[in-house]
């Protein structure tokens, strides 16, 4: 498949990359009107986005570093106002409906274990954006240690700054307090692509 060829290209062409794997986490519902805008004729109000964890191990000065890209804590992410409304609107039937709307394939913890990686061996986590993300489980906060005790968050400075001062229309898509209490030394702010 194309994915297998891409994986092999990463491993063959770049001697720094020593391991790469993607693992399905959860199929999350997303409004079709936002996902496809006007490019659809489907009457379905939702489309599914497959959240995957990408595990990359690479060498830096002959040391292997581990990066987890998109480690979604979907148990905490349901506090995002949009998803909170969606997951509670069916009352007593909500658990059944939620298992249909957002089927879970793996947790991040299961995915990392499948790769044979210990939590303390994770050096970095990162996301394409922080909306809908609660990263406290992974990095810890003032009250609770993180699941990945040595990991640092790689994030664009502009994204981090935006998350700390959301506009009213953005709040529906950001997890309340998703970055609250994270120690500054656990965050690496990036000014540009690396």
Region spans (language model):
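Metallo-beta-lactamase
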Residues: 1-109, 111-117, 152-194
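Beta-sheet entry/capping signal
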Residues: 16-19, 66-67, 123-124, 152, ...
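Residues that flank catalytic or metal-binding motifs in active/ligand-binding sites
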Residues: 49-52, 149, 183
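Active-site neighborhood of phospho(di)ester-bond hydrolases with catalytic His/Asp-centered motifs
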Residues: 68-71, 123-129, 154-156, 190
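Catalytic metal-binding/acid-base residues of hydrolase active sites
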Residues: 74, 131, 159
